[in-house]
Amino acid sequence: MADYGTYLGNGAYLGPDYTAQALHVYLQGMYRYYAKTLYGKSFNKLTTLQQEGIKGKVKEEIRVNRYNAKDKELTLTKAQTAGYQYLLKYYRKAFINNPKQVGLPDNMIKNRTNEYMVKGNKVDQLTAFFFWGAWLSSTNRLGRSYSYTNNWPYDLEAGNVMTPKAMTWTGISVALLVMGVAIAIWVQKKYNFESKAQYQKDVPIIEPDTLPITTSQRKTAKYFALVMVLFLVQILLGELMAHYYVENTFFGIALQNIWPFNLAHSWHLQLVIFWVATTWLGAGIYIVPRVLRREPVRQGILVDVLFWALIFVVGGSMLGEWLTDLGVLNKNWWLFGNRGWEYLELGKFWQYLLIAAMVLWIVMLMRGFVPAMRRKDNQPRTRLVTMLFLGAIAVPAFYCASIFIMPDSHVTFADYWRWWIVHLWVEGIFEAFAVILTGWLLVDMKLTTIKSTIRALYFQLILLLGSGVVGTGHHYFWMGDHSLWLALGASFSALEIVPLSLLVWEAYTHYRVYQDTYHNFPYKTTFIFLMWTGIWNTLGAGALGFLINAPAINYFEHGTQWTAAHAHGSMAGVYGMFSIAIILYVLRNVTVKEFWTAKMEKAIRWSAWLLNIGLAGMVFATLMPVGQLQLADALKYGYWHARQMSFYHEKLISLILWGRMPWDLIFTAGVIILLVVCWKALFHLKKADNQAAAAEYERFAAAETKSQVNEIDE
């Protein structure tokens, strides 16, 4: 259900938040109990004074913690028991007697008992889990005046209001942001932590049209063709999900029985991880002969093995998720099917295979990077290569945090590790690897000096990882963890904006390179997307991230469409645009000169505009306005109300959601153009010549080393 609705605010956004909804229904059941017990009437027949008296009594009653930690026993009052019974009836009707759930097939929940399950009615067991969320979100921690979730979700009838800590640390985080930006800019300028332009100098320039390539480099092209196929499928699934917000079927076709919303959501998230990661793999493989200055023995065979391993993992995991969601795969569902955790839906078997594939990639990199790191002839280049290799190792290393999540893991502990993947791995390690890889590209294309680039990378990585690691805590505000995370998460997530703000200047630098380099500079299409990467890093990851991460806003916003706006702006805007830049760089080097006609480069420029106009429309013309109205609804009626399906069916909301279609189509057109480019590139590849490539790389390295004698390290 986390790929349909949310629990503790985490999950997908079409369905309700089951914590908030269960809390609201649970309270209604208690009201009914006291109305009948005290007055012998239904609650809605009571006077306003009588109703308010019952609400006050219930609010006091649910705040009392009756859990016995020694005996591990929770005692409910008679009214709470009545509320729980009312909750059971509610969900039996919602999931069984009244099965029409938007975007889901009828009677989706089956009473089957498999691994990690206990016997009994599955709807009732699910209800018990929802009730537990309602209880921990409305019952005070022992010795505290706020609940286990720091009084989230917002619900006045439950006594859930924002704690003073949330407001206090929001103010402090804003002050830290202002101070952090000022200090970072001062340090950057004072100690010259910027990449120095080098393209004006008389230095050796790589000419991709005459550059020989090796066998393994030639084979990377198919990785990028696969990337574009996965990218296209991913956005089509996203558009199907967007359509489910406005009607249950797809223009009258009952696709929800074949591709329900939760399956589309699972695939949508998995595919973005797969295609971005595949881009990293392809880029790393291309770089190996460049740093080693020759082709490693039988490297091409390993490239093929890794490629087909990726297809097996992607196809197998998606099939397993499909069969699980349709109720076909039941036995060993957690190994081969859908485990239900957002971004980690793939079964354990596929997860281990993915880790194994990334380890194979590291082995392939080691064959080139380790010998290169031992060289003494060019120390600055060696340091840059070492940074890139360590960044690559971090990609599979930090993904291993996902193996700690098992089907019987406590939700708070499991979500703790899940955010290591969603935030620390995707937003942290991916970002760090992207920053280092960008530096390597700038140096490799002789646009910046090595020494200045290394200094700039050290500075950026210290800021990025120094704030980002602890900044993961802003995901722990309301999930049952310690209130200490309100302070740590608010402070460090604000500081995360500092390095992202500096990327505005990086974006301008890329634009300047694009404008100022000589007319026949071969990588201008790459720099178009690098420029957009910097812009979206500031807008999507930076501005929108800070907007929703401040505790005082996140308390009401958590799990609304503003979260989706941030996710699209950062994931598609940053990693999407950067991945495309990497793809275009490699393709420019491995394809023949005749492929890069003026018409081809014009098509890529069109693609860049279509992608960014479409993405901006999705984020700022649809998700942000809907999120703002949703936030207003939560403030007025309570969080549970803003997450009901009825909210999306309001006339204005429905109109805005229908208005997303043109932006989706524009974005799709941009992807299709890139798909055509990548597939055409497969038929215009250079012939591999390992000996010629080795000779050229040695010549280039010698010329580079000589040029560094005159490089001034300012």
What are these regions (language model features)?
Residues M1-K165:
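Soluble extramembrane regions of membrane proteins in the secretory/endomembrane system
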Residues M1, G29, E115-G180, I213-V233, ...:
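Membrane-entry segments of alpha-helical transmembrane domains in multi-pass membrane proteins
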Residues D3-Y7, A12-T48, R290-V291, V297-L365:
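Hydrophobic or amphipathic alpha-helical targeting/insertion segments
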Residues I185-S195, D202-K222, H243-Q256, P260, ...:
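Juxtamembrane membrane-water interface segments of multi-pass membrane proteins
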Residues V227-G238, L306-G320, I393-V395, T533-T538, ...:
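Hydrophobic alpha-helical membrane-insertion segments
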Residues L390-F398, E431, A456-T472, V498, ...:
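Hydrophobic membrane-spanning alpha-helices of multi-pass integral membrane proteins
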Residues A695-E714:
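Short, intrinsically disordered terminal tails adjacent to the first/last structured region
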